[in-house]
Amino acid sequence: TPGRLADILLVEDLREMKPSQVYFEGRLVAKDCKLIQTCEVGEYPEWLKNTVKLKQLITEKSFRVPARTDRPQTQVTVIDLIDRQIINKRLIATLPCVNGEILADPVHDILKLAIVERYGKTGGVGVGFVRGFGLREGAMAYSMSHDHHNIVVVGVNELDMAQSVKVIQEMQGGLCV
């Protein structure tokens, strides 16, 4: 746009994506893969730094999925990830139920997935199940989902999920593994 400063990456071959020139705020800062000028980034305004305002304390209980049966197992709908695809499949899986709660099944790569509202408006936590992450222990959480920028957390158990969300809150956003 005329009159605006741009960040541009020029490549000669889209298959290699090797930059020949890099422009930062309209200035040439790298040429032929060599930095020729530093890229000073200014301070972020305060309103960008404090955006994780959880309305309620997130604990293990926040990620519990109640079982609607007294049986030791139940069928649930699972998001079945397709490697390197944005479109996924729907899977019906049988998961264990213990003490009135549906549990994840990490042995079969079925984990809990949750979205935690981060702006202090509703305090909502939506929990489901996902297969295909390959996570065998622990949890990961991040706050940079392009659709909504709430906190997304996936984990083998609820305690690790809650701890990951706590770290995201303490960092005021980011990625926690």
How would you describe each model-predicted region?
Residues 1-177:
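Active-site microenvironment of metallo-dependent hydrolases
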